[in-house]
């Protein structure tokens, strides 16, 4: 496919000390890598060369392919990726203990890939956009925060029994449909295809004939060794260690030792739809600031805060919107070819008065 020969993989490298990072930076610079060219520099090393360099200098480094499924610059990307970790990292595949989901895939989608059975699924977020920091996250449980604990939690095999001292408790996810490469499509022609439609119509644009950008969902279908149904996804009540509040997370009966995940919509987007105002508007930003300052941060508002407290600060409609997201009662037009998916909480009912049923629902909290 287009750009298959380039094989560029955005890779995270975690090391236990600043000195280790300096040693790696010095060696990469010596090899001609311009690390100052960009926040995510293209260094001209293959995945095998990068792994060899890093692990020779820091054996305890963690090497994690980032946003593993996006079409470009990713491990499994349809436009420039590989079909397996072995193909990408060769003899160092055994040192790849995790992959990162990216916005357009969920842990459940990754659980369908056989070679990931023995690897952790982690989720992080962009480091280049302040308001979007932490929109996806990995929650660890460990006696004390340390690199050793993080390394141990990520390295351990997901099928191991017992409860280790350091482990991944769960991950916090975007709805993958909201990611901008979830479905296959062609932005210029407004063409968006599900995997079923892609199989029926092919990977050329039905309007102009140009190649489509094959989306993450289609790529997962191409490489999967099992169906989504075989995962036996189920809802689990997970108790937060911070305040004892229970949240609903998604786990798998087929893979019971896999850390579960919870899917969220960014708070500003919920407020914006609830108030019928743009995300960047003063009205939305003021409400957002009021909530996080009073209740203790965006994740606390989205996951743990009592709905009645949210209603006091932001109004009943915002509170009901957050509750609907917690319950998964939303509709999303999937993203494709660089276009983000669109979340709808009220299915076109923006601006209407709060329904009586919603008032009753709110009174339960």
Q: Where in the sequence are the language-model features?
A:
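Active-site neighborhood of phospho(di)ester-bond hydrolases with catalytic His/Asp-centered motifs
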Residues: 1, 64-66, 98-104, 120-128
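C-terminal functional module detector
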Residues: 1, 9, 15, 27-30, ...
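Extended substrate/RNA-proximal surfaces in nucleic-acid metabolism proteins
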Residues: 1-97
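Active-site environment of divalent metal-dependent phosphoester hydrolases
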Residues: 20, 70-73, 104-109, 123-133
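Short amphipathic alpha-helical segments and helix-helix/interface helices
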Residues: 51-55, 109-114
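Short acidic, glycine/serine/threonine-rich loops at helix termini
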Residues: 75-79, 111-112, 133-137
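Extended hydrophobic/aromatic segments used for targeting, binding, or gating
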Residues: 90-91, 105-109, 330
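Short, surface-exposed basic-aromatic patches at helix termini and helix-loop junctions that form
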Residues: 91, 111-120
